[in-house]
């Protein structure tokens, strides 16, 4: 019997159609990637290839205008340690920066809708990104699944530009201003998503952090008014173009209160089910017949501070919960940081390879 390619196996698993092998998937911070090359893979080695990971991101889309100097007027000072991204958001780094930077918001002082509407938000076109289709085909020919990455889809992109406190105040007391910000971001994100969909990606990876460690970031009423309908419109347009595309949605933190909204919006897979915030068995029993999952192995607890045996037990236990049909791409819930020992990373990969379906 012909075995499935890594791509076929992953897509079957995420669609809860059974699977042959458990995929290995994780991301390393730069220092861990360096130690991988020094201690395990060799100079220049690709850890995704080394561990046989079944998917690759096709790459970030290129905006029509790549000249970031158009954002300079939104800042009082452009510092040497500051970078401005393609959305115009400033990032100040420091010698101790590992994963995050100090973020500067170009529209934090805006008071009028006209200031939002005149903001030079990036424009993305199919013509500028015709290369995506070739990249998708290249990955598929290698038997790998293709991923269009759009984490920071609506909420995070909007507050990156406006500032979180400002945007939340707008949502409560200046709805016209909030509408202008969200409309601007929704249009840009929809354009990006459609480029990926038309290029034929297997998976569209969306996301906005809408949870905190032990609670949701906003009320259900605010979420259903501001974010849910925009996400649903975006996904609906994508699935009109590519009905079989798999949509994964990322949000750190506790978000159980929002899961039904996400399912109704058209999400197929939820990431990461942060182990320190939510119990996977409970979440699976409530929602596992309608949605699949990616993650579940804690990066605040078992990955950095557990034993290799505990890592394996977590992996096998969660796979047992999901059962033979799949529905769980078991993986660490976040980027692996320097405190995670290689013994635990290798134990995770071994657990995936050693797992026997019950």
Residue map of PLM features:
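Segments that shape or occlude catalytic/ligand-binding pockets
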Residues: 33-73
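A contiguous, low-structure linker/loop signature
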Residues: 69-119, 141-145
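Active-site loop segments of alpha/beta catalytic cores
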Residues: 1-40, 84, 93, 116-358
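Short, solvent-exposed loop/edge-beta patches enriched in aromatic
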Residues: 18, 51-56, 76-79, 140-142
């Amino acid at each position: 019997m012909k075995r499935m390619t890594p791509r076929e196996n992953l897509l079957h698993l995420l669609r809860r159609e059974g699977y042959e092998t458990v995929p290995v998937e994780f991301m390393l911070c730069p220092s861990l990637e360096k130690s991988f090359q020094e201690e395990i893979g060799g100079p220049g080695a690709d850890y995704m290839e080394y561990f046989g990971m079944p998917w690759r991101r096709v790459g970030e889309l290129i905006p029509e205008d790549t000249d970031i100097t158009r954002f300079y007027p939104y800042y009082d000072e452009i510092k040497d340690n500051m970078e401005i991204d393609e959305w115009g958001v400033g990032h100040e780094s420091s010698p101790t920066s590992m994963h995050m930077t100090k973020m500067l918001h170009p529209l934090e002082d805006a008071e009028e809708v006209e200031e939002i509407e005149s903001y030079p938000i990036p424009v993305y076109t199919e013509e500028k990104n015709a290369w995506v289709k070739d990249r998708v085909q290249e990955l598929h020919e290698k038997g790998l699944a293709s991923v269009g990455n759009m984490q920071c889809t609506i909420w995070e992109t909007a507050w990156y530009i406006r500032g979180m406190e400002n945007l939340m105040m707008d949502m409560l007391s200046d709805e016209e201003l909030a509408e202008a910000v969200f409309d601007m971001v929704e249009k840009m994100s929809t354009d990006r998503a459609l480029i990926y969909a038309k290029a034929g990606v297997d998976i569209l990876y969306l996301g906005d952090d809408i949870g905190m460690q032990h609670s949701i970031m906003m009320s259900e009423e605010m979420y259903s008014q501001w974010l849910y309908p925009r996400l649903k419109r975006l996904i609906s347009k994508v699935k009109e173009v590519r009905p079989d595309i798999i949509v994964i949605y990322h949000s750190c933190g506790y978000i159980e209160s929002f899961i039904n909204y996400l399912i109704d919006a058209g999400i197929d897979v939820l990431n990461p089910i942060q182990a320190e915030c939510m119990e996977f068995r409970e979440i699976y029993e409530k929602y596992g017949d309608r949605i699949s999952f990616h993650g579940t192995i804690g990066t605040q607890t078992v990955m950095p501070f557990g034993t290799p045996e505990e890592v394996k037990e977590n992996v096998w236990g969660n796979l047992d919960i999901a059962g033979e049909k799949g529905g769980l791409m078991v993986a660490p819930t976040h980027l692996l940081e320097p405190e995670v020992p290689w013994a635990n990373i290798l134990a995770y990969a071994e657990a995936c390879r050693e797992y026997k379906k019950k």
